[in-house]
Design a protein with these regions (language model features):
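N-terminal secretory signal peptides that target proteins for export/translocation
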Residues: 1-11
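Intrinsically disordered, low-complexity segments
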Residues: 2, 24-25
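A residue-level detector for conformationally permissive "hinge/kink" positions
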Residues: 8, 22, 69-70
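Bacterial N-terminal signal peptides
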Residues: 12-24
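Sec/Tat signal peptide C-region and signal peptidase I cleavage site
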Residues: 26-30
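Long, low-hydrophobicity ectodomains and other hydrophilic envelope-associated domains
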Residues: 32-76, 80-194
Length: 194
């Protein structure tokens, strides 16, 4: 072999190693544990409002295959099937709302334009029941999941929504539709990494 061929082979090998390392580091960074803090606020029809701190500690994110499996479960059997699938899986972190802590069973991150991200967090049990005019509102059949949607900004605080007790189904356009136990929307503001 000529010296120039050996140099080309060496360069190609080093380039391959560098590309592999970049891919591995990106994968590790995407799976790194993440803690987010926010303020959850709700206002009822009479104008009374309540705000409490929220902490979402995410220890692992779902793969595309796990996402597809969850969507298939919702299509097949709605909330009950989704809950069964989620209960079998390992915890992906926790949501702490005030003094109540609930296991996250599914955490999925999607990159948006400009470096923003959309996170979907799902619990296999309600985070709490908001409504019925009482702080300790009672459960209603079928509202068995908790959902958190977070829009994280590349710079500055993000925002989101918390559906503390929900039913889920798939509509005719294959979109996930949620039905909230309560009439009031829980807004998440000032969402930042801790």
């Amino acid at each position: 072999m000529k010296k120039s061929q050996l140099i080309q082979i060496a360069r190609a090998t080093w380039l391959g190693i560098v590309v592999l390392m970049v891919c591995l580091l990106s994968s590790v960074r995407a799976q790194a544990p993440e803690t987010l803090v926010a303020t959850a606020s709700v206002k009822n029809a009479s104008g009374a409002s309540l705000s409490v701190p929220v902490t979402a500690s995410i220890t692992r994110f779902a793969s595309d295959a796990e996402r597809d499996a969850l969507l298939a479960a919702v299509k097949k059997g709605g909330t009950a099937a989704a809950r069964q699938l989620l209960e079998k899986g390992a915890d992906a972190g926790s949501i702490e709302l005030g003094s109540r802590k609930t296991a996250i069973k599914y955490a999925y991150a999607r990159t948006l334009g400009g470096g923003d991200r959309l996170l979907t967090l799902v619990t296999a049990q309600p985070v709490f029941f908001l409504g019925a005019g009482a702080p300790e509102a009672k459960p209603k059949a079928g509202y068995d999941l908790g959902l958190v949607l977070l829009e994280l900004k590349a710079s500055g605080p993000g925002k989101g929504e918390l559906v503390p007790a929900a039913k889920v189904r798939v509509d005719a356009q294959n979109a996930i539709v949620t039905e909230d136990y309560g009439a009031e929307m829980v807004q998440l503001t000032n969402v930042v990494k801790k």
